[in-house]
Design a protein with these regions (language model features):
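Secretory targeting and sorting signals
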Residues: 1-15
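Exposed, interaction-prone regions of secreted/extracellular proteins
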Residues: 15-272
């Protein structure tokens, strides 16, 4: 492990007077179908980012879902998670959003609790008029005292108004926060990422912001452990597995998020 000399302070709608510890970069997490960054080592209540519409019109039989997430298991592997992001209408149709035209993109929000037999809350909003590379801002806020989850989706002005959603949280605790791509088939089922002939950028995550349960703020790094997520040929770390999709290094886009401009708040996801 290595540490970055960064500090994060503050909160979503709250101030913090004590200093926070430096950010920590954790061991890379290897999968067959996911790529991005995951924060762990704290309980989290807020995550936001601007996600760009994927540059993947030429892909067939593979559909990237991109989203921000709070969960009680690494890589969404626990029994509770909440997500907000972008997916293709082809995938959304398989979940009942029949008015989503094939070839277009939609925003979505989703809350999952295994004890409630799967996703208990979901909403879609067609991203009409967007082009590849256009940004859509998403935020998820967990109001623990009110036992509520709040979602905000802000598309480009040409694609409609800001969307607000709220649902119950059912006493959730979220020790993981991530921003990632998840590669699926047309039904939304995760599938191994195939071999690509040429490297290309799939999409970007900008203006990343995370807040812990106790109000410590950061970007994609902060007073927690941040781990890179790679999709490899067999789910094993390189060199045992060949990296097929991975995020770029974290960089700074200079844009304000959650009340401040912070370093290391952006990355791209690349087919390798």
């Amino acid at each position: 492990m290595s540490t970055l000399g960064l500090a994060a302070a503050g909160a979503a709608n709250a101030a913090v007077s004590s200093p926070s510890r430096p950010a920590t970069i954790g061991t890379t997490l290897s999968t067959t179908s996911q790529a991005g960054y995951e924060a762990s080592g704290r309980d989290f209540r807020y995550i936001s980012s601007t996600l760009t519409v994927p540059d993947t019109d030429f892909l067939t039989e593979i559909y990237p879902q991109e989203y921000i997430q709070l969960s009680n298991g690494s890589l969404g592997g626990g029994d509770q998670y909440v997500r907000a992001g972008i997916e293709s209408c082809t995938v959304a149709q398989s979940f009942g959003y029949s008015s989503c035209p094939t070839g277009d993109w939609t925003s979505f929000v989703e809350a999952f609790n295994n004890s409630l037999s799967g996703p208990y809350f979901s909403h879609y909003s067609l991203l009409s008029g967007v082009s590849q590379g256009d940004g859509v801002n998403f935020s998820i806020y967990y109001n623990e005292s009110g036992n509520e989850l709040h979602f905000v989706v802000t598309p480009p002005s040409t694609s409609g108004p800001t969307q607000y959603y709220k649902t119950q949280a059912y006493g959730a605790i979220f020790p993981y926060a991530s921003a990632q791509d998840d590669f699926t088939d047309s039904t939304g089922t995760p599938i191994p990422v195939p071999f690509f002939l040429h490297a290309f950028r799939i999409n970007q995550f900008l203006q990343g912001a995370i807040t812990t349960e106790h109000g410590l703020r950061g970007s994609f790094v902060g007073p927690w452990t941040t781990s890179q997520i790679d999709a490899t040929s067999n789910g094993l770390p390189y060199p045992s597995g060949t990296v097929r999709v991975s995020p770029s290094n974290l960089w700074s886009d200079g844009l304000s998020a959650n009340g401040a401009v912070r370093p290391y708040d952006a990355f791209g996801v690349w087919a390798r």
